[in-house]
């Protein structure tokens, strides 16, 4: 799947709902919840590239209610910045993966508009053979 934000995110500590769908043919990403649902066990690659504007940002990638990757970017006044992260994860059927802003509202500079994108992508590299 490959998805993006359509507007600035304002709510911390809940899954970010990426509603701009670039690719989601198998429908394993649910835009209403912001979560990827694993239907095929195996090794997955996830990445995110976020635009930072107006505030610092703290973003976590979660697997099954546990943060496994953290990204922090400090906003530089009057500039748009970028931050990114990527990880390989082994998933079982039923596992869920998502991104969320963590902390308080002071660290919620995650941004998107018609010329600045924030994206989240994931795909299966190898399925389990046993």
Regions found by a protein language model. Give the residues of each.
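Extracellular jelly-roll beta-sandwich "head" domains, especially the C-terminal globular C1q domain
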Residues: 1-130
């Amino acid at each position: 799947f490959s998805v993006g934000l359509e507007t600035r995110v304002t709510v911390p500590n809940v899954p970010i709902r990426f509603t701009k769908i670039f690719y989601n043919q198998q429908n394993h990403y649910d835009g209403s919840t912001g979560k990827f649902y694993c239907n095929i066990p195996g090794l997955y690659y996830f990445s995110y590239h976020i635009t930072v504007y107006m505030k610092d940002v703290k973003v976590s990638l979660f697997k099954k209610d546990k943060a496994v990757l953290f990204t922090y970017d400090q906003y530089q006044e009057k500039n748009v910045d970028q931050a990114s992260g990527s990880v390989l994860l082994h998933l079982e059927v039923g596992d869920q993966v998502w991104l969320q802003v963590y902390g308080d509202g002071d660290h919620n500079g995650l941004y998107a508009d018609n010329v600045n994108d924030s994206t989240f992508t994931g795909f299966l590299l190898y399925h389990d053979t046993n």
